[in-house]
Amino acid sequence: MAITINLRATWGQYAPWLRQEHASLPPVPGEPWSGHMGVFLHYLGTGSTSNLQTEEDCRRAVAGVYEDHVNSSEYEGDIAYNFLVCPHGHIYQGRGYERGAGNAGKAPFIEGVGRNEGFYSILGMIRSQDVASEAMLRSIRNLIDHLRHEAPRKTGKIILPHSFQYDTECPGNLHMYARQGTTIDPSAPWRGPADIYVYRTQKWVNATYIAAPGYVFCPETGYTGWNTVLSLTQGLQHELGISPTVQNFGPGTFNAVKNRESVPEFERNENLLRLYNGALWCKGYWASQFLGGWGEESEASLRQLYADMGLDHANAGQRLAMWPHVLKSLLRMDQFRLVPGGDPHVRAIQQRLNARYVAGIGIPAMSLVPCDGIYSRDVQQGLMMAIQYETGIALGSINGYFGPGTQAALKGRGSATLTGDLRYLFRAACYVNSPTYTANGQAHYLPADIGTDARTGTHVGWLQAFQRFSQLPVTGHNDYATWAQLLVSSGDTSRDATGCDCITEITPQRGQLLKANGYHIVGRYLDEHLAPGDEGYLGKALKPGEPQAILNAGLRFFPIFQYNGTELGNFTYDKGYDQGKKAHAKAAEHGIGAGTCIYFGVDYDATDEEITSHVVPYFNGVKAALAELGSRYTFGVYGSRNVCIRVSKDAGARWSFVSGMSWGFSGNLGFPLPENWSFNQIHEYEFQAGWGLDHNIWRDGGDPGVSAVGRG
């Protein structure tokens, strides 16, 4: 990597006059020296570098380090460090590529190699009260990459703090970066600056509870995550007398917090205060820098957290009653401030759910929902519980599931004229399912319609558009089918559908049965990657002559291709390219005509990150293969709503086949039906003994499927 290293002369001019010439000269070679092992990180010592405002300040500071070292016999008459990196990200030459003297050469050897003989030394120009700037960290990362790949004497993979096997506080707050795999390691992903208070929390919780039964050590990285908050949870359990500790904030932990009847401002157990402060730091709220104290900084952040959750901190009774809920949420990765991509109107819905149904009604099964503006699985479950309450389901029976009791309640009270809170919840469900689509493009639900009791024209218009797009009866009313479509991706699973798919061969007799039961199109698999005799073999592939048998029964069919679509490892560009070619060959073998859409399956709950890293590249491979073979066939995608939306947008899928019956998938929560949906798989059932069938809504004007075949 090309980097700029400022030579000694840039700072040598600031050395005392009698030493300026020596300070500015190139470094003198020293022996023994190889530098092949790695790097040590250093800092300037105690205090603050708040005086390093300009680059001239930094050059003077480097000259000051030189002056300290040149007067000491310990450093062999020169500045000790090979390179120095300032807060502005500028890199300065010290000993450069020659042997340095800053790594505590008399300390124990590492793998038989002396610390000054085998390691470069890099000084980050911070002191004990400072944290490294992003510019400094990026430059250290780039410098290490340069030393590994471009330096005259290339170094190895090791990254260590000066304190490794040596009694020193150095490198101060750079400790959390001074190892392999951190953000300064060019072989690891860039993560940006870590949080020193999260790091100190991680160090403290590990040191304090490592001997507690069941305790799991959390990585000391300075970045929060599930590992950290679960270790904090175990620390909490230990302080509350729960043993062995477990990585779960369950009913036992909740009740132990509740029975303590104390909020942080009145807590006298310093370890509990350390846990609470650490949890605030991990959640991104400022807290006491002394973990064992609870001052105004911590209390102010807690007040803000209550407000962010939609709770009333000023109400002493509610503050105490909600504390177990608040602490449980603190010790999770839920966010309560608007995150990038979050919607403030969704956040208002989330806060209202917390205020009314957790703090107000006190639904026993309901936890605080995140308030980040993202409609997630937990928020969907909270909304479902609120609807269950407002439709008359007993508190003890509320569970957040779209089961028979909920369905019956929605067919009754839910389908009557709505007022008050139930009307609000219905309209909130409309908003989180927005946009829907019309012939003119996207139709967004108006935020102003969420909280009004008026039956506005904009509300009715959107609702009718949603029903029409979802292929429901267009009533403009809160009927059961509409409720179901708003709440779960499968919608009303009892509704009629003209599409289906299966792994079973469609014989002439089976084709006639499908036709007689109202089906007009069936999805069938082009191939199977397992051979007969394999324990996982399903026999799902189209059989010779089967396409014509389907057509002779008065049906159409649509081709599906899926090899190991349930595993992330299947989704790479190369596998997509290979499977695209196989799908083309199989479709042509069966005489399927040009222009047909082949659906490639993503049959698991792929996260947004996995869609970006694996699924989209896979479909780009499919696209390249089909194009290389003349673009005889187009490609579609089978998967959750989010998978279908992303693959259609980022890879160009023609049609979407939505796995709507997987209503628990995160990719089916908070995402609308894709604009290009053609099939919505809503129900799986046994059509006949041994013949399982998926019940699919086939969209009017969608993919026409295959209506004729030629010779293969």
Regions found by a protein language model. Name each.
Residues 173-178, 605-629:
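Active-site cleft segment of glycoside hydrolase catalytic domains centered on the general acid/base Glu
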Residues 79-91, 160-166, 224, 294-297, ...:
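Acidic helix-start/capping segments at beta-turn-to-alpha-helix junctions
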Residues 58-65, 140-141, 508, 539-544, ...:
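Well-ordered, non-membrane alpha-helical segments in soluble/globular domains
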Residues 37-43, 80-86, 90-94, 119-124, ...:
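Structural recognition of the beta-strand scaffold that forms the well-ordered cores
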Residues 1-115, 169-170, 482-565, 654-665:
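N-terminal catalytic cores of peptidoglycan-degrading enzymes
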Residues 534-606, 610:
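Substrate-binding cleft of extracellular glycoside hydrolase catalytic domains
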Residues 1-48, 87-193, 625-704:
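Basic/polar, cationic surfaces and motifs that engage anionic cell-wall
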Residues 170-521, 525-530:
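Cell-envelope/ECM-targeting effectors and their regulatory/trafficking segments
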